[in-house]
Amino acid sequence: MSQRRVVITGLGQVSPVGNDVQTAWNNLLSGKSGIGLITRFDASDINSQIAGEVRDFDIGQYISGKEARRMDVFIHYGIAAALQAIDDAGLDALESLDKDRVGVNIGSGIGGLPSIEATGKAVIEGGARKINPFFIPGSLINLIAGHVTILKGYRGPSYGMVSACTTGAHSIGDSARLIKYGDADVMIAGGAEGAISTLGVGGFAAMKALSTRNDDPATASRPWDKGRDGFVIGEGAGVLVLEELEHAKKRGAKIYAEIVGFGMSSDAYHITAPNEEGPALAVTRALKDAGLNPEDVDYVNAHGTSTPLGDANETKALKRALGDHARKVIVNSTKSMTGHLLGAAGGVEALYSVLAVHEQKSPPTINIFEQDIEAGCDLDYCANEARDAKIDVAISNSFGFGGTNGTLVFKRFND
């Protein structure tokens, strides 16, 4: 039996560069940073006081205020991105949609950290009686999927993956396989995160993982630049509608791209420090799954976090996986503008990779003032200006604490 093909028919996102897909994409192509000083809480006693915050977001556009008050902000972002993607795909207008065959898999790397923080404070100040009865369901990671299935009546697979900063990529790759294996015809998949809080920022700052360039937030995230000093935390959600090809064609769906490969690996090395073998394996396995060669790759949306070790390591991994062809590929980090969305990163970056294929454009990697050639960061990072390019095959890399790696391969759709 021939393997079922999976295409992308809907996109939705909430991010520091915009609260809908078109706004975000336009801002990325313009090289506009979404990073600024933290306004969500008083960060004056933390050495990193900058973040990619979602601004001017109104969850009331998607659900009632009563419902919203019972959920953590990461669930808000996930629901919003999912409903955008569902609307973009035109699923609600499809009377013949078999909702038993539609599932949702939207994960988060951390989940309801602000709710946990606020509840802990309430207990300290007033005892256990102060715990909100919606605290648990309002902070569980799988509740994004739960709420979307309830809102839309979908009765297919419903779950939320947790794999640190690889969550979004794993969710999308796993969902594509569910469709290929026949467990669903449509999957709503991606990642969401909302951890800009004292614990979230303070925790990463304690690890010395964050940029401390507080005097110039817009240039703080600078992947592959000699002056990079850590990542900038971000928040938001990115969600794709994945659909079996014949199902999409039968209803005349708009097709952005095809997802043709997914690879996973483990570093088996260190809980936070990277090594090149693990990420290279993920890329190699994804290309093998896609039936493609390294020479077929045109574009890489890199993990590219702006850390001294991570950026150099990913460059080495790409050279290991792609060989000499690595020098002919556009390697781009949209984190230079969004910051690092943690568990949502793989979701928004998969979405941006799909748009790169669909629009034949690479966003820039901004803030490359002096490329760090001495550290081996010597590839084409699409520095500082967007570029029109032939992008038939794009890969999106996501790597997470614990040495968990995921690579997605998207291809220009050709029936």
Language-model regions, residue ranges each:
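Acyl-CoA/ACP chain-elongation machinery
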Residues: 39, 183-229, 262-274, 304-311, ...
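ACP-dependent fatty acid/polyketide chain-elongation machinery
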Residues: 1-67, 246-258, 351-365, 411-415
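Phosphate/pyrophosphate-binding loops at sites that engage ATP/ADP/AMP, CoA/4′-phosphopantetheine
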Residues: 85-98, 248-255, 283-299, 321-325
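Conserved catalytic cysteine-centered active-site region
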Residues: 1-3, 37-80, 101, 111-174, ...
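Glycine-/small-residue-rich "gating" segment that lines the acyl/pantetheine channel
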Residues: 126-132, 170-173, 177, 194-250, ...
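Short, well-ordered amphipathic alpha-helical segments that serve as non-catalytic structural scaffolds
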Residues: 78-89, 144, 171, 243-245, ...
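Condensing-enzyme catalytic core mediating Claisen C-C bond formation in acyl metabolism
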Residues: 5-9, 36, 215-290, 299, ...
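Conserved small-residue
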Residues: 10, 28, 82, 104, ...
